[in-house]
From Swiss-Prot:
<keyword id="KW-1048">Host nucleus</keyword>
<dbReference type="GO" id="GO:0031423">
    <property type="term" value="F:hexon binding"/>
</dbReference>
<keyword id="KW-0945">Host-virus interaction</keyword>
<keyword id="KW-1232">Capsid decoration protein</keyword>
<protein>
    <recommendedName>
        <fullName>Hexon-interlacing protein</fullName>
    </recommendedName>
</protein>
<dbReference type="GO" id="GO:0042025">
    <property type="term" value="C:host cell nucleus"/>
</dbReference>
<comment type="function">
    <text>Structural component of the virion that acts as a cement protein on the capsid exterior and forms triskelion structures consisting of three molecules that stabilize three hexon trimers at the center of each icosahedral facet and fixes the peripentonal hexons. Dispensable for assembly. During virus entry, recruits the anterograde motor kinesin-1 to the capsid docked at the nuclear pore complex thereby subjecting the docked capsid to a pulling force.</text>
</comment>
<keyword id="KW-0175">Coiled coil</keyword>
<dbReference type="GO" id="GO:0046718">
    <property type="term" value="P:symbiont entry into host cell"/>
</dbReference>
<comment type="subunit">
    <text>Homotrimer. Interacts with hexon protein; this interaction tethers the hexons together. Self-interacts with adjacent proteins. Interacts with kinesin light chain KLC1; this interaction leads to capsid disruption at the nuclear pore complex during virus entry into host cell.</text>
</comment>
<keyword id="KW-0946">Virion</keyword>
<feature type="region of interest" description="Disordered">
    <location>
        <begin position="25"/>
        <end position="45"/>
    </location>
</feature>
<dbReference type="GO" id="GO:0098021">
    <property type="term" value="C:viral capsid, decoration"/>
</dbReference>
<feature type="coiled-coil region">
    <location>
        <begin position="72"/>
        <end position="99"/>
    </location>
</feature>
<dbReference type="Pfam" id="PF03955">
    <property type="entry name" value="Adeno_PIX"/>
</dbReference>
<keyword id="KW-0167">Capsid protein</keyword>
<dbReference type="InterPro" id="IPR005641">
    <property type="entry name" value="Hexon_assoc_IX"/>
</dbReference>
Length: 103
């Protein structure tokens, strides 16, 4: 191997032959070889880490509320349909009782 080419990766894939001085990938938030975080120069670094989680949790709660509201509307529709069925059955029973009483 040519000494000037030592440590150079000539493929589009990362391999395990990258020397230890190469560090982590550039322009991404990741970790170095020791497991410590490496900040990105490109990604936004001024925002607090908890902010996306709080916003995501809030959005998730809103979606859950929408889902619950849809389920409640479906249940209300089903209950109304069942009440109409019960009313129709009660009217049929009333008619049958009148027919039986007339005989």
């Amino acid at each position: 191997m040519d000494p000037q080419q030592k440590g150079i990766v000539n493929t589009c894939f990362l391999t395990t032959r990258i020397p230890s001085w190469a560090g982590a990938r550039q322009n991404v938030t990741g970790s170095d070889l020791g497991g410590k975080p490496v900040p990105s120069d490109v990604l936004e670094s001024g925002r607090p880490l908890a902010a996306p989680r709080v916003r995501t949790l809030y959005e998730e709660q809103q979606l859950n509320m929408l889902t619950v509201n849809v389920i409640l509307d479906d249940l209300k529709t089903q209950v109304a349909a069942m009440q109409n069925s019960v009313t129709a059955i009660q009217e049929e029973l009333k008619d049958l009782k009148q027919r039986v009483a007339a005989r």
